[in-house]
Protein backbone atom coordinates (compact mmCIF):
# COMPACT_ATOMS: atom_id res chain seq x y z
CA UNK A 1 0.00 0.00 0.00
CA UNK A 2 1.46 3.36 -0.96
CA UNK A 3 1.96 5.98 1.73
CA UNK A 4 -0.42 8.35 -0.04
CA UNK A 5 -3.28 5.85 -0.20
CA UNK A 6 -6.58 7.18 1.11
CA UNK A 7 -9.52 5.17 2.34
CA UNK A 8 -13.16 5.70 3.20
CA UNK A 9 -15.15 5.32 6.38
CA UNK A 10 -18.83 4.45 6.39
CA UNK A 11 -19.41 7.95 7.77
CA UNK A 12 -17.23 10.97 8.45
CA UNK A 13 -15.97 11.75 11.94
CA UNK A 14 -18.75 13.52 13.88
CA UNK A 15 -17.73 17.03 14.85
CA UNK A 16 -18.90 17.12 18.44
CA UNK A 17 -17.95 20.47 19.94
CA UNK A 18 -17.48 18.86 23.35
CA UNK A 19 -14.66 16.55 22.23
CA UNK A 20 -12.04 19.11 23.15
CA UNK A 21 -13.70 20.50 26.26
CA UNK A 22 -11.55 18.37 28.55
CA UNK A 23 -8.46 20.28 27.41
CA UNK A 24 -9.72 23.25 29.45
CA UNK A 25 -9.34 21.20 32.63
CA UNK A 26 -6.55 22.27 35.01
CA UNK A 27 -4.54 19.11 34.27
CA UNK A 28 -3.23 20.72 31.07
CA UNK A 29 -1.17 23.69 30.01
CA UNK A 30 -1.45 25.62 26.75
CA UNK A 31 1.05 23.36 24.98
CA UNK A 32 -1.17 20.33 25.58
CA UNK A 33 -4.24 22.22 24.38
CA UNK A 34 -2.48 23.28 21.19
CA UNK A 35 -1.17 19.75 20.69
CA UNK A 36 -4.66 18.24 20.89
CA UNK A 37 -6.13 20.83 18.55
CA UNK A 38 -3.35 20.42 15.98
CA UNK A 39 -3.52 16.64 16.00
CA UNK A 40 -7.31 16.62 15.69
CA UNK A 41 -7.07 18.84 12.60
CA UNK A 42 -4.29 16.67 11.15
CA UNK A 43 -6.27 13.47 11.72
CA UNK A 44 -9.35 14.93 10.07
CA UNK A 45 -7.33 15.85 7.00
CA UNK A 46 -4.87 12.96 6.75
CA UNK A 47 -6.46 9.81 8.20
CA UNK A 48 -9.04 8.14 5.99
CA UNK A 49 -9.77 4.79 7.56
CA UNK A 50 -10.46 1.77 5.38
CA UNK A 51 -7.92 -0.81 6.44
CA UNK A 52 -7.07 -3.23 3.69
CA UNK A 53 -6.29 -6.92 4.03
CA UNK A 54 -2.57 -6.10 4.18
CA UNK A 55 -2.51 -4.85 7.76
CA UNK A 56 1.29 -4.99 7.87
CA UNK A 57 1.66 -2.57 4.97
CA UNK A 58 -0.99 -0.27 6.40
CA UNK A 59 0.70 -0.17 9.79
CA UNK A 60 4.14 0.46 8.30
CA UNK A 61 2.64 3.27 6.23
CA UNK A 62 1.02 4.81 9.31
CA UNK A 63 4.33 4.74 11.23
CA UNK A 64 6.05 6.52 8.34
CA UNK A 65 3.19 9.03 8.09
CA UNK A 66 3.20 9.76 11.83
CA UNK A 67 6.97 10.14 11.72
CA UNK A 68 6.97 12.58 8.81
CA UNK A 69 4.33 14.69 10.53
CA UNK A 70 6.39 14.88 13.72
CA UNK A 71 3.96 13.12 16.07
CA UNK A 72 6.37 10.31 16.93
CA UNK A 73 8.77 12.87 18.39
CA UNK A 74 6.61 12.72 21.53
CA UNK A 75 7.65 9.08 22.04
CA UNK A 76 11.30 9.94 22.75
CA UNK A 77 13.17 12.71 24.62
CA UNK A 78 14.51 15.82 22.88
CA UNK A 79 18.10 14.72 23.52
CA UNK A 80 17.60 11.98 20.93
CA UNK A 81 15.29 13.50 18.34
CA UNK A 82 12.15 14.03 20.41
CA UNK A 83 9.89 17.02 20.94
CA UNK A 84 10.13 17.43 24.74
CA UNK A 85 12.92 17.17 27.30
CA UNK A 86 11.41 14.00 28.74
CA UNK A 87 8.46 11.71 28.15
CA UNK A 88 5.30 13.63 29.02
CA UNK A 89 2.38 11.46 30.12
CA UNK A 90 -0.23 14.11 29.42
CA UNK A 91 1.04 14.63 25.89
CA UNK A 92 1.09 10.88 25.27
CA UNK A 93 -2.48 10.58 26.55
CA UNK A 94 -3.79 13.52 24.51
CA UNK A 95 -2.15 12.10 21.40
CA UNK A 96 -3.49 8.59 21.94
CA UNK A 97 -7.01 9.70 22.78
CA UNK A 98 -7.17 11.86 19.67
CA UNK A 99 -5.71 9.22 17.37
CA UNK A 100 -8.01 6.51 18.77
CA UNK A 101 -11.07 8.67 18.23
CA UNK A 102 -10.15 8.92 14.55
CA UNK A 103 -8.42 5.61 13.75
CA UNK A 104 -7.60 2.70 16.03
CA UNK A 105 -4.74 1.40 13.88
CA UNK A 106 -3.10 4.84 13.83
CA UNK A 107 -3.28 4.86 17.62
CA UNK A 108 -1.73 1.37 17.65
CA UNK A 109 1.11 2.49 15.36
CA UNK A 110 1.86 5.47 17.59
CA UNK A 111 1.55 3.56 20.86
CA UNK A 112 3.89 0.73 19.90
CA UNK A 113 6.62 3.19 18.91
CA UNK A 114 6.46 4.58 22.43
CA UNK A 115 6.12 1.29 24.29
CA UNK A 116 8.67 -0.47 22.10
CA UNK A 117 11.32 2.19 22.65
CA UNK A 118 10.39 3.24 26.19
CA UNK A 119 12.80 0.82 27.83
CA UNK A 120 15.65 2.31 25.78
CA UNK A 121 14.66 5.81 26.89
CA UNK A 122 14.56 4.74 30.54
CA UNK A 123 17.51 2.36 30.79
CA UNK A 124 19.52 2.35 27.57
CA UNK A 125 23.15 3.38 27.28
CA UNK A 126 23.95 6.59 25.40
CA UNK A 127 25.03 4.47 22.45
CA UNK A 128 21.75 2.53 22.36
CA UNK A 129 19.72 5.71 22.67
CA UNK A 130 21.61 7.34 19.83
CA UNK A 131 21.33 4.31 17.54
CA UNK A 132 17.62 3.65 18.01
CA UNK A 133 15.63 6.60 19.35
CA UNK A 134 16.14 9.14 16.53
CA UNK A 135 14.99 6.52 14.02
CA UNK A 136 11.91 5.78 16.13
CA UNK A 137 11.05 9.48 16.30
CA UNK A 138 11.38 9.84 12.54
CA UNK A 139 9.27 6.76 11.81
CA UNK A 140 12.26 5.13 10.13
CA UNK A 141 12.52 2.21 12.58
CA UNK A 142 9.58 0.24 13.98
CA UNK A 143 9.83 -0.77 17.64
CA UNK A 144 8.34 -3.67 19.62
CA UNK A 145 8.10 -4.67 23.29
CA UNK A 146 8.61 -8.41 23.86
CA UNK A 147 7.58 -9.42 27.37
CA UNK A 148 4.81 -12.07 27.28
CA UNK A 149 5.44 -15.79 26.82
CA UNK A 150 3.18 -18.79 26.14
CA UNK A 151 3.15 -19.64 29.87
CA UNK A 152 3.96 -16.22 31.32
CA UNK A 153 1.57 -13.40 30.54
CA UNK A 154 0.50 -11.35 33.54
CA UNK A 155 2.84 -13.46 35.69
CA UNK A 156 5.96 -11.86 34.24
CA UNK A 157 8.23 -13.34 36.89
CA UNK A 158 7.40 -16.84 35.58
CA UNK A 159 9.06 -16.26 32.21
CA UNK A 160 11.19 -19.09 30.86
CA UNK A 161 12.99 -17.50 27.88
CA UNK A 162 16.67 -17.42 28.87
CA UNK A 163 19.86 -15.54 28.08
CA UNK A 164 23.17 -17.20 28.94
CA UNK A 165 26.34 -15.13 29.16
CA UNK A 166 29.02 -16.33 26.73
CA UNK A 167 32.04 -14.03 26.71
CA UNK A 168 30.92 -10.60 25.52
CA UNK A 169 27.60 -11.94 24.21
CA UNK A 170 24.42 -13.44 25.60
CA UNK A 171 22.76 -16.44 23.95
CA UNK A 172 18.96 -16.21 23.92
CA UNK A 173 16.73 -19.28 23.79
CA UNK A 174 12.96 -19.56 24.14
CA UNK A 175 9.78 -17.92 22.90
CA UNK A 176 7.81 -14.71 23.23
CA UNK A 177 4.19 -14.37 22.15
CA UNK A 178 1.43 -11.79 21.69
CA UNK A 179 4.13 -9.42 20.48
CA UNK A 180 2.62 -6.33 18.89
CA UNK A 181 4.49 -5.24 15.74
CA UNK A 182 5.85 -8.78 15.57
CA UNK A 183 6.81 -9.43 11.97
CA UNK A 184 7.23 -5.77 10.97
CA UNK A 185 9.46 -4.45 13.77
CA UNK A 186 13.06 -3.47 13.09
CA UNK A 187 14.03 -4.22 16.68
CA UNK A 188 12.56 -5.75 19.83
CA UNK A 189 13.09 -4.83 23.49
CA UNK A 190 13.19 -8.37 24.88
CA UNK A 191 12.95 -9.42 28.53
CA UNK A 192 14.59 -12.73 29.41
CA UNK A 193 15.76 -14.73 32.38
CA UNK A 194 19.49 -14.34 33.08
CA UNK A 195 19.37 -16.03 36.49
CA UNK A 196 21.12 -13.59 38.84
CA UNK A 197 18.42 -14.39 41.41
CA UNK A 198 15.12 -16.29 41.59
CA UNK A 199 11.90 -14.80 40.23
CA UNK A 200 11.69 -11.21 39.07
CA UNK A 201 15.20 -10.34 40.22
CA UNK A 202 16.75 -12.67 37.66
CA UNK A 203 15.41 -10.95 34.53
CA UNK A 204 17.37 -8.72 32.14
CA UNK A 205 16.39 -6.68 29.08
CA UNK A 206 18.05 -6.50 25.66
CA UNK A 207 17.57 -4.70 22.37
CA UNK A 208 17.52 -7.35 19.65
CA UNK A 209 17.56 -6.36 15.99
CA UNK A 210 14.99 -8.18 13.87
CA UNK A 211 17.64 -9.55 11.51
CA UNK A 212 19.73 -11.12 14.29
CA UNK A 213 20.53 -14.77 13.42
CA UNK A 214 18.55 -17.13 15.62
CA UNK A 215 15.51 -14.85 15.90
CA UNK A 216 12.57 -16.00 13.79
CA UNK A 217 8.88 -15.26 13.49
CA UNK A 218 7.39 -18.58 14.56
CA UNK A 219 3.75 -17.62 14.04
CA UNK A 220 1.64 -14.70 12.89
CA UNK A 221 -1.45 -14.27 15.08
CA UNK A 222 -4.81 -13.04 13.77
CA UNK A 223 -7.13 -11.27 16.21
CA UNK A 224 -10.54 -9.60 16.08
CA UNK A 225 -9.10 -6.12 15.56
CA UNK A 226 -6.31 -6.84 13.06
CA UNK A 227 -2.84 -5.49 13.76
CA UNK A 228 0.67 -6.95 13.41
CA UNK A 229 1.02 -9.62 16.10
CA UNK A 230 3.39 -12.58 16.33
CA UNK A 231 5.10 -15.30 18.31
CA UNK A 232 8.90 -14.99 18.33
CA UNK A 233 11.38 -17.84 18.65
CA UNK A 234 14.96 -17.47 19.86
CA UNK A 235 17.27 -20.38 19.03
CA UNK A 236 20.92 -19.87 19.93
CA UNK A 237 20.41 -16.16 19.22
CA UNK A 238 23.64 -14.30 20.05
CA UNK A 239 23.24 -10.72 21.25
CA UNK A 240 26.12 -8.47 22.28
CA UNK A 241 26.26 -7.67 25.99
CA UNK A 242 26.34 -4.00 24.99
CA UNK A 243 22.71 -4.42 23.85
CA UNK A 244 21.59 -4.96 27.43
CA UNK A 245 19.29 -2.31 28.93
CA UNK A 246 20.51 -1.38 32.39
CA UNK A 247 22.28 -3.75 34.72
CA UNK A 248 21.91 -7.53 34.67
CA UNK A 249 18.94 -8.58 36.78
CA UNK A 250 17.20 -5.21 36.42
CA UNK A 251 14.93 -6.18 33.52
CA UNK A 252 11.76 -6.61 35.58
CA UNK A 253 12.22 -3.14 37.05
CA UNK A 254 12.76 -1.70 33.57
CA UNK A 255 9.62 -3.44 32.27
CA UNK A 256 7.47 -2.17 35.15
CA UNK A 257 8.81 1.39 34.80
CA UNK A 258 7.99 1.31 31.10
CA UNK A 259 4.48 -0.04 31.67
CA UNK A 260 3.82 2.52 34.41
CA UNK A 261 4.48 5.34 31.95
CA UNK A 262 2.41 3.95 29.11
CA UNK A 263 -0.44 2.28 31.06
CA UNK A 264 -2.31 5.58 31.45
CA UNK A 265 -2.06 6.06 27.70
CA UNK A 266 -3.92 2.76 27.19
CA UNK A 267 -6.72 4.31 29.23
CA UNK A 268 -6.54 7.35 26.96
CA UNK A 269 -6.93 5.17 23.87
CA UNK A 270 -10.01 3.53 25.40
CA UNK A 271 -11.29 7.02 26.14
CA UNK A 272 -10.85 7.96 22.49
CA UNK A 273 -12.85 4.92 21.40
CA UNK A 274 -15.58 5.77 23.93
CA UNK A 275 -15.80 9.40 22.83
CA UNK A 276 -16.17 8.32 19.22
CA UNK A 277 -18.89 5.85 20.20
CA UNK A 278 -20.73 8.54 22.15
CA UNK A 279 -20.53 10.86 19.14
CA UNK A 280 -21.84 8.14 16.84
CA UNK A 281 -24.62 7.26 19.30
CA UNK A 282 -25.68 10.90 19.63
CA UNK A 283 -25.78 11.37 15.87
CA UNK A 284 -27.80 8.19 15.44
CA UNK A 285 -30.23 9.05 18.24
CA UNK A 286 -30.95 12.48 16.77
CA UNK A 287 -31.39 11.28 13.19
CA UNK A 288 -33.07 7.87 13.47
CA UNK A 289 -36.86 8.11 13.06
CA UNK A 290 -39.13 5.47 14.56
CA UNK A 291 -42.72 5.43 15.77
CA UNK A 292 -43.15 9.01 14.61
CA UNK A 293 -40.29 10.47 16.62
CA UNK A 294 -36.53 10.35 16.86
CA UNK A 295 -34.69 7.72 18.85
CA UNK A 296 -33.49 10.54 21.10
CA UNK A 297 -37.06 11.29 22.15
CA UNK A 298 -37.31 7.99 24.02
CA UNK A 299 -36.47 8.18 27.71
CA UNK A 300 -34.59 4.89 27.54
CA UNK A 301 -32.27 6.43 24.93
CA UNK A 302 -31.80 9.55 27.04
CA UNK A 303 -30.92 7.44 30.07
CA UNK A 304 -28.36 5.50 28.02
CA UNK A 305 -26.80 8.71 26.70
CA UNK A 306 -26.60 10.11 30.22
CA UNK A 307 -24.79 7.02 31.46
CA UNK A 308 -22.45 7.05 28.47
CA UNK A 309 -21.48 10.70 28.89
CA UNK A 310 -20.88 10.27 32.62
CA UNK A 311 -18.68 7.21 32.02
CA UNK A 312 -16.61 9.11 29.46
CA UNK A 313 -15.99 12.03 31.81
CA UNK A 314 -15.21 9.76 34.77
CA UNK A 315 -12.68 7.83 32.68
CA UNK A 316 -11.12 11.08 31.48
CA UNK A 317 -10.73 12.36 35.03
CA UNK A 318 -9.00 9.17 36.18
CA UNK A 319 -6.77 9.06 33.10
CA UNK A 320 -5.57 12.64 33.18
CA UNK A 321 -5.22 12.66 36.96
CA UNK A 322 -2.71 9.82 36.65
CA UNK A 323 -0.83 11.59 33.86
CA UNK A 324 -0.81 14.91 35.75
CA UNK A 325 0.46 13.30 38.94
CA UNK A 326 3.37 11.76 37.08
CA UNK A 327 4.26 14.90 35.10
CA UNK A 328 3.62 17.69 37.59
CA UNK A 329 3.89 16.10 41.02
CA UNK A 330 6.54 13.64 39.77
CA UNK A 331 4.87 10.92 41.79
CA UNK A 332 4.91 7.20 41.20
CA UNK A 333 1.49 6.44 39.72
CA UNK A 334 1.25 2.65 39.77
CA UNK A 335 -2.12 2.72 41.56
CA UNK A 336 -3.55 5.69 39.68
CA UNK A 337 -2.55 4.36 36.27
CA UNK A 338 -4.06 0.97 37.12
CA UNK A 339 -7.31 2.64 38.17
CA UNK A 340 -7.41 4.62 34.95
CA UNK A 341 -6.64 1.62 32.76
CA UNK A 342 -9.18 -0.59 34.51
CA UNK A 343 -12.05 1.89 34.53
CA UNK A 344 -11.47 3.46 31.12
CA UNK A 345 -11.28 0.15 29.26
CA UNK A 346 -14.21 -1.45 31.07
CA UNK A 347 -16.47 1.58 30.76
CA UNK A 348 -15.52 2.11 27.11
CA UNK A 349 -16.72 -1.42 26.36
CA UNK A 350 -20.10 -0.51 27.87
CA UNK A 351 -20.31 2.85 26.08
CA UNK A 352 -19.52 1.25 22.73
CA UNK A 353 -22.01 -1.56 23.32
CA UNK A 354 -24.77 0.96 24.03
CA UNK A 355 -23.87 3.00 20.97
CA UNK A 356 -23.96 -0.13 18.81
CA UNK A 357 -27.39 -1.00 20.22
CA UNK A 358 -28.72 2.33 18.96
CA UNK A 359 -27.81 1.29 15.43
CA UNK A 360 -29.68 -2.00 15.64
CA UNK A 361 -28.68 -4.41 12.88
CA UNK A 362 -26.68 -1.70 11.11
CA UNK A 363 -24.33 -1.66 14.09
CA UNK A 364 -23.00 -5.15 13.47
CA UNK A 365 -22.43 -4.79 9.73
CA UNK A 366 -18.78 -5.54 9.04
CA UNK A 367 -16.86 -2.28 8.68
CA UNK A 368 -19.45 -0.06 10.36
CA UNK A 369 -17.80 2.41 12.71
CA UNK A 370 -19.43 1.10 15.88
CA UNK A 371 -18.72 -2.49 14.81
CA UNK A 372 -15.05 -1.60 14.38
CA UNK A 373 -14.98 0.13 17.76
CA UNK A 374 -16.58 -2.94 19.36
CA UNK A 375 -13.75 -5.13 18.08
CA UNK A 376 -11.01 -2.63 18.86
CA UNK A 377 -11.90 -2.01 22.50
CA UNK A 378 -11.93 -5.67 23.52
CA UNK A 379 -8.18 -6.22 23.47
CA UNK A 380 -7.51 -3.09 25.54
CA UNK A 381 -9.14 -4.82 28.50
CA UNK A 382 -6.42 -7.49 28.24
CA UNK A 383 -3.10 -6.16 27.03
CA UNK A 384 -0.59 -4.29 29.20
CA UNK A 385 -2.27 -5.91 32.19
CA UNK A 386 -5.76 -7.40 32.14
CA UNK A 387 -8.55 -5.81 34.17
CA UNK A 388 -8.23 -8.48 36.84
CA UNK A 389 -4.53 -7.74 37.21
CA UNK A 390 -5.21 -4.01 37.52
CA UNK A 391 -7.56 -4.76 40.44
CA UNK A 392 -4.81 -6.75 42.14
CA UNK A 393 -2.33 -3.92 41.60
CA UNK A 394 -4.75 -1.38 43.09
CA UNK A 395 -5.41 -3.59 46.11
CA UNK A 396 -1.71 -4.27 46.61
CA UNK A 397 -0.94 -0.55 46.61
CA UNK A 398 -3.78 0.14 49.05
CA UNK A 399 -2.59 -2.55 51.44
CA UNK A 400 0.98 -1.32 51.18
CA UNK A 401 -0.07 2.25 52.01
CA UNK A 402 -2.31 1.08 54.85
Question: Where in this protein do the model-derived segments appear?
Answer:
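Alpha-helical interface subdomain recognition
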Residues: 2-101, 123-128, 135, 139, ...
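Short Gly/Pro-enriched turn/cap motifs at secondary-structure boundaries
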Residues: 109, 136, 151-154, 178-181, ...
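A short core secondary-structure module
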Residues: 169, 173-216
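A gly/ser-rich beta-alpha-beta helix-loop segment of oxidoreductase catalytic cores
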Residues: 142-165
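Flexible, small-/acidic-enriched active-site or ligand-binding loops
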Residues: 158, 211-238
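Short beta-strand-to-turn element immediately C-terminal to the catalytic PLP-Schiff-base lysine
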Residues: 121-124, 164, 190-194, 207-209, ...
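N-terminal glycine-rich flavin-associated loop
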Residues: 104-127, 153-156
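Long, acidic (Asp/Glu-rich), low-complexity accessory segments flanking structured domains
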Residues: 235-254
Amino acid sequence: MSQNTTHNVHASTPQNARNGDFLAWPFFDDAHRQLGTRLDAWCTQELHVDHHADTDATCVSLVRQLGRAGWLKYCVPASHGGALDKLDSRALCVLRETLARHDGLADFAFAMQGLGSGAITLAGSDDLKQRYLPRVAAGEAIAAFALSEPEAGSDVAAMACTATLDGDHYVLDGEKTWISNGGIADFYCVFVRTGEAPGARGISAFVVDADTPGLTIAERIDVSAPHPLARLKFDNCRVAASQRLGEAGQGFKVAMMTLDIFRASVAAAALGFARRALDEGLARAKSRQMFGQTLADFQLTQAALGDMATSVDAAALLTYRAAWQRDVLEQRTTREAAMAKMYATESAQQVIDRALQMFGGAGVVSGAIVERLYREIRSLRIYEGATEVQKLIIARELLKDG
